[in-house]
Amino acid sequence: MEKIKTIDLFAGCGGLMDGFEQTGLYETLAAVEWEEAPCRNLKKRLSSKWKYADAENRVLRFDIQRTQELFDGWNDEIYGKSAGLSNLIGNNTLDLIIGGPPCQAYSIAGRVRDEFGMKNDYRNYLFESYLKVVKKYRPKAFVFENVPGILTAQPDDRPIIEIIQEQFADAGYCLLANLKQAIIDFTEYGVPQNRSRIIILGLDKKYYGEEESKNLVEKFYNEVLPSKKKPKKNAWDAIGDLPKLYPLGHDEKYNGKRISHSLPNPFVDNHIARWQSERDIEIFKLLEKDIEENRFEFISTDALKKLYTQKTGHKSNVHKYHVIRKDEPSNLIPAHLYKDGLRHIHPESSQARTITVREAARLQTFDDDYIFYGSNVELFKMIGNAVPPRFSKILAQALYELLFKEM
């Protein structure tokens, strides 16, 4: 069987792509990503797990805004040398483009934090680069992933989603009329984490026909994707079997870095606890026991803000701490988890720590055979930015059934 020819834009470390590869139905012709650390990991994953002998060439580290060079090739001080995307696609007919621009400019939380509401952020218009690639290669379909906040983002005088809908329609693609229906709650697909994303499917009206495109898009959201819902998973389903990491009571060194907790036994890749201060360990124990013993003294925002001030001497407008509950999906795994992890405290008081890279990856549904390489900062960031592969696989299966099965 000939595989579905796909390219992945804004690929990150490949969460979206990994789910598609797991089905065995798709071939990744190219993946485009501008950050070095995700590219490094993506190349390793494509070669070691998915057995692409030419992974080095298929992963293009480049700035997608330089679209013409992306197509034709470049020789660049920062990004090195490549023959470009058109060379990789060659004579293949492209079936599918997947990916989504960075979501920070559309994120409601990001807009609240930024004094200008992210109106001046260049990332508001990265969808235009995605669109240029779609227009150039005319795939039968595309999947555009982003945060639900994109529906309300308005950097100029019009909502960004109106511009996106209009420009993709002008390019000859059919999208769902009411994109609120395109918001998907990933907990409904077995992802053990409270994470919702907008998944925009676009179909080439010239290829499928005007009326059939509309029917297929509606069928995708109303029938095909919902038919693949899975039982809900809790955080403990994902991380409960990992080796326990206990406070040592003193600092030690491991690989030249300071550690405050025991190493995993048996060893598990990427499962090393961050160094925690004695003060933080004490706070974590207090918060974890508060839940374990059903006291719930520190559930309210005010109580948590008061505790933070009492323990650190500083004031905060937002509460800093959150303990992951064993019997619920975890809170969102964000890209900024690399900063401190205080909102992702492990549920067990005996461990008194924030979650590890491997636990974040498990909550994002990456398989343990995806071994991440880089600093904690790089790894937490790329994992937090990813689409959970468990959902990606379901998405890939749904698209295959709807669009590609009879090809």
Where are the model-predicted features located?
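Short, acidic Gly/Pro/Ser/Thr-rich loop/turn segments
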Residues: 104, 207-209, 338-343
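Short, well-ordered beta-strand micro-motif
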Residues: 98, 199-203, 334
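Short alpha-helical patches at coil-to-helix transitions and adjacent helical residues
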Residues: 13, 161, 197, 385-389, ...
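Core alpha/beta nucleotide-donor-binding catalytic domains of modification enzymes
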Residues: 2-138, 148-159
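C-terminal target-recognition/interaction regions appended to catalytic cores
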Residues: 257-407
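A generic secondary-structure signal for well-formed alpha-helical elements
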Residues: 24, 46, 101, 151, ...
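Class I S-adenosyl-L-methionine
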Residues: 75-79, 84-91, 106-309
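Short, flexible loop/turn elements at secondary-structure junctions
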Residues: 10, 36, 64, 101-102, ...
